[in-house]
UniProtKB/Swiss-Prot annotation:
Subunit of the V1 complex of vacuolar(H+)-ATPase (V-ATPase), a multisubunit enzyme composed of a peripheral complex (V1) that hydrolyzes ATP and a membrane integral complex (V0) that translocates protons. V-ATPase is responsible for acidifying and maintaining the pH of intracellular compartments and in some cell types, is targeted to the plasma membrane, where it is responsible for acidifying the extracellular environment. Subunit C is necessary for the assembly of the catalytic sector of the enzyme and is likely to have a specific function in its catalytic activity. GO terms for molecular function: proton-transporting ATPase activity, rotational mechanism. The gene is atp6v1c1a. This is V-type proton ATPase subunit C 1-A. It comes from Danio rerio (Zebrafish). The modification N-acetylthreonine is found at T2.
Length: 383
């Protein structure tokens, strides 16, 4: 279970008492959740007006940063293609897995100095994550173009003999070249019609060179045959071939063109390999940065909301709960009983959400008498 509930409640005589009460209610007898203290440093409070405005801004920033974290994670999965099982081991925060980072969260004083105002810290995070978002768009666009061009070429070299590139199948010796009168055509013949082809190709038109057919290549359904004839008989031969279910490919042997195609394929393939390593490294580093920023926003939101709800001086205990999946409903009830005295208006809302009234919006349903934010470490939506 990778879902965490980050909550806070006011300090009793001491914050330790608040913690002990939660532990007794949720773990001592009933194993409802695994709990950790969530350490938030002494941040600068500022004025009430600023806190109220900041509360809304942080909610928007939270949603934006979460979306960037998910985008980076999803793009990592896209880039790693066949090794999706390796994605999780690349999605780390500060070199540790996400659950470990969240449960052992320590504020990063170097990145987000607590001498700065709350607004400044939120602006630092906003700027940092916007940069990651913009960089991701640019890098993804460049890599996707490269990958798309390579896939188009690969598609040309695969598929049916009726449409695929023939550059890697034919060679110069298969053709009569530089003749004023003669030309070699390539004909796709269904496997079931091989006998018909061998029996009739010389008589499909006048001026077909006898015994000039060779089988160059086969796929599941068809074979690619050569046939040499006089140029003036091409149209007649095409027409008769079509009537007999033989398809003449439009193909002119051009060594330079085929060489250029092969070189382009090699170049794109090499470029993709060259870009792959640095791109995965960039994604790892910036996933970590974005995820760390996201958890710091959660910490800021808990701090701001706790001050707005519980007042000054700052005295609350932030706690991180990892609910036991089978007991989530029970855990909500226990937390409600523990903290309902904090906010009487929450009682009505809890009762309503239990009844599941249609049209009651989620933000209202997710209002509790204690400060609550969800952190979900499952960031990948594998189709």
């Amino acid at each position: 279970m990778t879902e965490f509930w980050l909550i806070s409640a006011p300090g009793e005589k001491t914050c330790q008492q608040t913690w002990d009460k939660l532990m007794t209610a949720t773990t001592r007898t009933n194993n409802l959740s695994t709990n950790n203290k969530f350490n938030i440093p002494d941040l600068k409070v500022g004025t009430l007006d600023v806190l109220v405005g900041l509360s809304d801004e942080l909610a928007k920033l939270d949603a934006f940063v979460e979306s960037v974290v998910k985008k980076v994670a999803q793009y990592m999965a896209d880039v790693l293609e066949d090794s999706r099982d390796k994605v999780q081991e690349n999605l780390l925060a500060n070199g540790v897995d996400l659950v470990t980072y969240v449960t052992r969260f320590q504020w990063d004083m170097a990145k987000y100095p607590i001498k700065q105002s709350l607004k400044n810290i939120s602006e630092i995070i906003s700027k940092q994550v916007s940069q990651i978002d913009n960089d991701l768009k640019a890098r993804a666009s460049a890599y996707n173009n490269l990958k798309g061009n390579l896939q188009n070429l690969e598609r040309k070299n695969a598929g049916s003999l009726l449409t695929r590139s023939l550059a890697d199948i034919v060679k110069k010796d298969d053709f009569v070249l530089d003749s004023e009168y003669l030309i070699t055509l390539l004909v796709v013949v269904p496997k079931t019609n091989y006998t018909d082809w061998q029996r009739t190709y010389e008589t499909l038109a006048e001026m077909v060179v006898p015994r000039s057919t060779n089988l160059l290549f086969e796929d599941h359904d068809s074979g690619l045959f050569t046939v040499t004839l006089f140029r003036k008989a091409i149209d007649d031969f095409r027409h008769k071939a079509r009537e007999n279910k033989f398809t003449v490919r439009d193909f002119q042997y051009n060594e330079e063109e085929m060489k250029a195609d092969k070189e382009e394929m090699t170049r794109l393939s090499t470029d993709k390999k060259k870009q792959f390593g640095p791109l995965v490294r960039w994604l790892k580093v910036n996933f970590s940065e974005a995820f760390i920023a996201w958890v710091h926003i959660k910490a800021l939101r808990v701090f701001v909301e706790s001050v707005l709800r519980y007042g000054l001086p700052v005295n609350f205990q932030a706690m991180l709960l990892q609910p036991n999946k089978k007991n989530m409903k029970k855990l909500r009830e226990v937390l409600y009983d523990l903290y309902k005295h904090l906010d009487s208006s929450a009682a009505a809302i809890i009762d309503q959400s239990a009844m599941d009234i249609p049209g009651l919006n989620l933000s209202q349903q997710e209002y509790y008498p204690y400060v609550y934010y969800k952190i979900d470490c499952n960031l990948l939506d594998f189709k």
